[in-house]
A protein has these predicted regions:
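Active-site scaffold of zinc-dependent metalloenzymes
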Residues: 3-59, 72-76, 80-95
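Long, well-structured alpha-helical subdomains associated
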Residues: 104-109
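Short alpha-helical catalytic segment bearing the HExxH-like zincin motif
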Residues: 60-68
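Short, basic alpha-helical nucleic acid-contact segments in DNA-binding proteins
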Residues: 95-102
Length: 109
C-alpha cells in the first residue's frame, strides 16, 4: 500500500493510502480495515471508467475517501451496526459537503 497520509479518527491514527489490488479483490473502490487501522482506496486512474474525465475521477475518489472515513468513525465509536449500513454511510459521504456548507452558513461550526 502506498502511504499517503495519517488521519486521526477519534484519537486513533489510521493510515490512508492506495492499493488497487486490495480494492479489486473486494470488488470495491475503497476499504476501511478497522483492526489494521487502514483506509485504502483505488488509485485515481482506476476510479470509474477509463474514459471518465479526471475531474469526475477526482470527485469519486474524494467521495470514496469520505465514505471510508465515516466507516472508521462509526467503528471507533463502537457503532458497528451503523458502520455496516452501506446506505447510511454512503448518504453521509455524499451529503456531508452540503451539510458542512449549511453549517458554515448558519455559523454553527
Amino acid at each position: 500500500m502506498e502511504i499517503k497520509q495519517k488521519i486521526n479518527i477519534l484519537g486513533t491514527e489510521y493510515v490512508a493510502g492506495t492499493d488497487d489490488e486490495a480494492c479489486m479483490a473486494m470488488n470495491a473502490d475503497g476499504l476501511c480495515k478497522y483492526y489494521e487501522k487502514e483506509i485504502i482506496v483505488r488509485n485515481l486512474e482506476k476510479m470509474l471508467d477509463p474514459d471518465s474525465s479526471e475531474e469526475s475521477k477526482l470527485i469519486r475518489m474524494k467521495e470514496v475517501v469520505r465514505h471510508e472515513i465515516i466507516h472508521a468513525f462509526f467503528a471507533e465509536s463502537g457503532l458497528f451496526d451503523y458502520s455496516d449500513n452501506e446506505q447510511l454511510v454512503n448518504w453521509i459521504a455524499i451529503q456531508f459537503p452540503k451539510m458542512l456548507k449549511a453549517f458554515k452558513e448558519a455559523n454553527c461550526i
